[in-house]
Swiss-Prot record:
Ligand for the frizzled7 transmembrane receptor. Primarily acts via non-canonical Wnt pathways mediated by either Ca(2+) and PKC, or by JNK and dvl2/dsh. Depending on the cellular context, can also signal via the canonical Wnt pathway mediated by beta-catenin and dvl2/dsh. May also inhibit canonical Wnt signaling. Maternally initiates dorsal/ventral axis formation by a canonical route, which signals via lrp6. In a complex with wnt5a, activates the canonical and non-canonical processes involved in axis formation. CDD domains: Wnt_Wnt11. The lineage of its organism: Eukaryota, Metazoa, Chordata, Craniata, Vertebrata. A lipid is attached at S214 (O-palmitoleoyl serine). This is Protein Wnt-11b-2. The gene is wnt11b-2. Glycans are attached at N31, N38, N88, N299. It is found in: Secreted, Extracellular space, Extracellular matrix. It comes from the Eukaryota. Homodimer. Secreted homodimers form a complex with wnt5a homodimers; tyrosine sulfation of both wnt11 and wnt5a by tpst1 is required for this interaction. Interacts with the transmembrane receptor fzd7/fz7. Interacts with lrp6 and ryk. Interacts with tdgf1/frl1. Interacts weakly with frzb1 and strongly with frzb2/crescent. Interaction with frzb2/crescent antagonizes wnt11 function in the neuroectoderm, but enhances it in mesodermal tissue. InterPro entries: Wnt, Wnt_C, Wnt_CS.
């Protein structure tokens, strides 16, 4: 019996590693930052890459520093975006070894997949424009005719290249015939990856710089650039809040994802989807991937998700005072510096019981 339990445990671990394989690369922040990325052998030595991604790594070594940067940005942006929620994305720091909140097809994993997918393409697209990559350059000049008073110029983000390379990297584990995991899980992961990239594409906007005597802006040079990651993450957060729970069922001659509650319609390409309902994240429960909200900072005057009532799940909160030092009474002196005094201020903080 002990041997059987051991084998079952190993199978579950293997299955979990495949289920969340497409975001294991977020673990590259642990050891990828110390790699010079000048030898293909580095690719197989790193935690966080499944075999298909290791092959892509070997063929595209010059991209890997951008991939590491994307992993850092995705983890940081996720935690900033959810800092006011019970689930605050802190578990993403465990990459490449995830807890159930990110390994079981939850609403939270849907967000992280989408954000990671958008971030890697965003980072590569901007690396092209900044001249960091030898294999790409500025984005193509838009085909649309420029409007009155501006011309196309500058160096736009290379979204086309970013999407191609980013999708190849994050989608590889689900498209491999050798990968484990259920067909339903592969489908929702690919779907949520695509949602992330679509939000990224929708963020492409025209950016301009003025030219003219004394800043008159008689002529503007414009290019296509992506909005910053916090904007993209907030768009995805809105989709997270309205995500659709789905089931995998036979529809005609093939199996499809359909909304569990509204299975009369297909899943929309623009919505995040998930398979497993999440806990309320109020109490610590490692089996569910919940860290709980004890000792979390809350906002006494807020009526949102960071309010002490919601954040603390009705358990109440403790108050304490803290003295902070900040700049004050600043004066500008010609030319050209600012001098400030240092002032102390006492603030009241609140933490959940």
């Amino acid at each position: 019996m002990a041997l059987i339990r051991h084998c079952v445990t190993l199978l579950l671990i293997l299955c979990c590693s495949r289920l969340c394989g497409a975001i294991q690369w977020l673990g590259l922040t642990v050891n990828g930052s110390r790699v010079a990325w000048n030898e293909s052998e580095h690719c197989r030595l790193l935690d966080g890459l499944v075999p298909e991604q290791s092959q892509l790594c070997k063929r595209n070594l010059e991209l890997m520093q951008s991939v590491v940067n994307a992993a850092k940005q995705a983890k940081l942006t996720c935690q900033m975006t959810f800092s006011d929620m019970r689930w605050n994305c802190s578990s993403v720091e465990n990459a490449p070894n995830f807890t159930p909140d990110l390994s079981k097809g939850t609403r939270e994993s849907a967000f992280v997949y989408a954000l990671a997918s958008a971030t890697i393409s965003h980072t590569i697209a901007r690396a092209c424009a900044s001249g960091e990559l030898p294999t790409c350059s500025c984005g193509a000049t838009p085909a649309e005719v420029p409007g009155t008073g501006f011309r196309w110029g500058g160096c736009g983000d290379n979204l086309h290249y970013g999407l191609n390379m980013g999708s190849a990297f994050v989608d590889a584990p689900m498209k491999s015939s050798k990968s484990g995991g259920t067909q339903a899980t592969k489908m929702i992961n690919l779907h949520n990856n695509a949602v992330g990239r679509q939000v990224l594409m929708d963020s492409l906007e025209t950016k301009c710089k003025c030219h003219g005597v004394s800043g008159s802006c008689s002529v503007k040079t414009c290019w296509k650039g992506l909005q910053d990651l916090p904007h993209i993450a907030n768009e995805l957060k809105s989709k997270y809040l309205g995500a659709t729970k789905v089931i995998h069922r036979q529809t005609g001659t093939r199996r499809q994802l359909v909304p569990r509650e509204l299975d009369i319609r297909p899943v929309r390409e623009s919505e995040l989807v998930y398979l497993v309902s999440s806990p309320d994240y109020c109490a610590k429960n490692p089996k569910l991937g919940s860290y709980g909200t004890q000792d979390r900072v809350c906002n006494k005057t807020s009526v949102g998700s960071d309010s002490c009532n919601l954040m603390c799940c009705g358990r109440g909160y403790n108050a304490y005072t803290e003295t902070i030092v900040e700049r004050c009474q600043c004066k500008y002196y010609w030319c050209c510096y600012v001098m400030c005094k240092k002032c102390e201020r006492t603030v009241e903080r609140y933490v959940c019981k």
